[in-house]
A protein has these predicted regions:
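Cleavable N-terminal export/targeting peptides
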Residues: 1-13, 42-45, 78, 247
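Short N-terminal segments immediately surrounding and downstream of signal-peptide cleavage
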Residues: 9-23
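Outer-membrane beta-barrel translocator/channel fold
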Residues: 19-34, 49-70, 84-102, 106-239
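Short, flexible N-terminal segments of the mature chain
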Residues: 34-42
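Transmembrane beta-barrel wall of Gram-negative outer-membrane proteins
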Residues: 70-82
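Short hairpin/turn module used for nucleic-acid contact or packing/dimerization
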Residues: 237-247
């Protein structure tokens, strides 16, 4: 596998992880295991990820495999881009197709502006166009970020979300703790009404990256999301863990 990388490429990390989400009521659960490689090639950083997932409902079960890759490229001191693409089996586990293009602009000291576009095709040929913009502020060991995202779904129309995150770096070492808070809307269509109905969504997630040795990091994540739809209210509890070996 590694021989496929160019001679001037340097493998920087390998990650293996597991992610479990349990939904309330009859919404089932989702299991995800993945392996990930990150390599550095001159001004580019390359990511390769292979995931295996399972989505269980009360009476139905789906399995799927997803492959994805991303390239971060530093054009100069103030412009960095990220291009990502992913493909998966046609099931409710993952999006079938996923393409994203992000642009990061360091136009002010200790400030990073971000904008981007994302196209996703889901199970049953539902397509979603996503536009997002945000800003990150770097103040000592704290990184504070805000992002606004607009979604345009082929079957339900528009919705949006607002996300705030705060990351606190450890005084020494590479460990950190990060909190995400988000709130937004959801658009839904039903056979029994010609009108698009709207609901809401909110979530909270906390992650700890803990160095175990100079090369090995442990990541632990816990989160919860609440869905308020026109026909049902439910929530999902997420627990995730990963190990990263750095070269």
């Amino acid at each position: 596998m590694f021989s496929a990388l160019p001679a001037y490429a340097g493998l920087t990390s390998i990650t293996a992880g597991y992610d479990f989400t349990d939904y309330s009521g009859d919404h089932g659960n989702r299991n995800l295991a993945y392996a990930e490689l990150v390599a550095k090639v001159e001004n580019a950083t390359l990511l390769f990820n292979l995931s295996q997932g399972r989505r269980d409902y009360e009476t139905e079960h789906f399995n799927a495999t997803r492959g994805q890759g991303a390239v971060w490229y530093k054009w100069n001191n103030w412009l960095t881009t990220r291009t990502g693409i992913a493909f998966a089996d046609n099931t409710p586990v993952f999006a079938r197709q996923d393409f994203r293009q992000d642009i990061n602009l360091a136009l002010l000291p200790k400030t990073l502006f971000t904008t981007g576009y994302r196209y996703t095709k889901y199970y049953d040929d539902v397509e979603v166009d996503v536009w997002q913009g945000g800003v990150s502020l770097y103040t000592g060991p704290v990184i504070t970020s805000y992002r606004y995202t607009h979604y345009d779904s082929s079957d339900a129309g528009g919705s949006y979300s607002n996300m705030i995150s705060v990351r606190l770096n450890d005084p020494r070492g590479t460990g950190y703790t990060q909190l995400w808070l988000s709130r937004g809307t959801g658009a839904y269509t039903y056979d029994w009404t010609p009108e698009t109905r709207y609901g809401s969504m909110k979530s909270v997630s906390l992650q700890r990256i803990q160095p175990l040795t100079e090369q090995l990091n442990l990541g632990l994540t816990a989160g919860k999301v609440w869905y308020d739809t026109p026909t049902d209210d439910y929530n999902g509890l997420q627990l995730a863990a990963h190990l990263t070996w750095k070269f």
